[in-house]
Every structure is written in C-alpha cells, then in structure tokens.
Amino acid sequence: MARTVFCEYLKKEAEGLDFQLYPGELGKRIFDSVSKQAWGEWIKKQTMLVNEKKLNMMNAEHRKLLEQEMVNFLFEGKDVHIEGYVPPSN
C-alpha cells in the first residue's frame, strides 16, 4: 500500500515518496511532507535551473543556491524564475 502525506506544496493528501531522497533534516522534512507529484515538479524546475544558470554541483555555492530554490518552491510557494522562460499556456 502506498504511503500518503499531507503535501505542503499541493496542500492536500497525496502519495508520498518511497524513501528519503535528500540528506539531513531537510531531507526528512521533504520525505515527511512532499508528495511524489510535487517532487517530480521540483525535479523539472531543478533541471531547468541547472541548465540555464550553468550550475556546477561540485561548487558549494551553487548547491546552496539550488537548495534555497528547492525550499522556496516546495515549502514557501515561490515559483522558480528562469530568465526568458515562458510556461506553456493551456
């Protein structure tokens, strides 16, 4: 049976992650309160950020920037701003 969490991003009950994907206290918070769907949406944004800003995950400052963007996106309701990106209209 799938594990459910109250997703802070979606603001509703949803299927939770299968295991902790991120280390430390933040990883535990993500595991406890972010759904698979929300994590998938974050991964898309993360990929765009890494590519557009040419982030290098070997660089501690770049990792810190990406982590802050992740917290803003998943827990504070702030969308990721990517220069020149216009989301498709439905």
UniProtKB/Swiss-Prot annotation:
Keywords assigned by UniProt, alphabetized: Iron
Any one of the GO BP annotations: cellular response to oxidative stress
GO molecular function per UniProt: iron ion binding
GO cellular component terms, semicolon-separated: cytosol
InterPro entries: Fe_traffick_prot_YggX, Fe_traffick_prot_YggX_sf
Gene3D superfamilies: Fe(II) trafficking protein YggX (1.10.3880.10)
Role noted for this protein: Could be a mediator in iron transactions between iron acquisition and iron-requiring processes, such as synthesis and/or repair of Fe-S clusters in biosynthetic enzymes.
Family: Belongs to the Fe(2+)-trafficking protein family.
Protein name: Probable Fe(2+)-trafficking protein
Protein's organism: Haemophilus influenzae (strain ATCC 51907 / DSM 11121 / KW20 / Rd)
